[in-house]
């Protein structure tokens, strides 16, 4: 079993292997190219082209290629991916991410974003949210605060810190922050596969407002709010802040959905079969 495309170069020749790509990384670089300068567009498109060729070469040499969602698997197939291509979705440890076992207290409305804070899509998401969504929310909810929770915040992320914007850096445990959230937000514009940050917030029974990109790939059945523009996100968050009962009901439904759909035992069954670990 080999995890992530970066490690594929170390696979011994002739050894049967299952390759877990997680996402189609070449497609991610193609997306980066769409938003960069002329020089960056050229570089990112070149990286996407070369990486795509490498991904296809690897997939032709292994027993199976795994992706984190059926959408990613279908994208890889459409791009010429060879061999057996299987979707093995992310799951969640719902026993660990259980609000019943976490104490948290907060004063006033708190919005929480979690993630690795030197990862470009996360950096861009929180910067956009702080600049575009928070000012709209403050017009109707002046006491609202925004917590950016995650390790290795870049200088750009640290510069967002203000009396009503908390930049935590690394934390020992993200669960108290999730438990304290009035609403968890995932305003990513670029996202691939399934966002663990969204599943974790749902498992903690928190109401979630996610961008279409962040919600894509999650079979949420309406148990989170999907909102695209800054105005739409501000309205969705504001409505949940104004109606705590509705917010609580949405969070409870989100946890129930995670328990039903994203339990690790069910999610890993295809991998067990591929590795010959089934009963």
Task: State the predicted function of each range.
Residues 63, 165, 179-193, 204-207:
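Acidic donor-binding loop of glycosyltransferase active sites
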Residues 223-231, 238-245:
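Conserved acidic donor-binding segment of nucleotide-sugar-dependent glycosyltransferases
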Residues 246-261, 270:
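A short, well-ordered alpha-helix in the C-terminal region of glycosyltransferases
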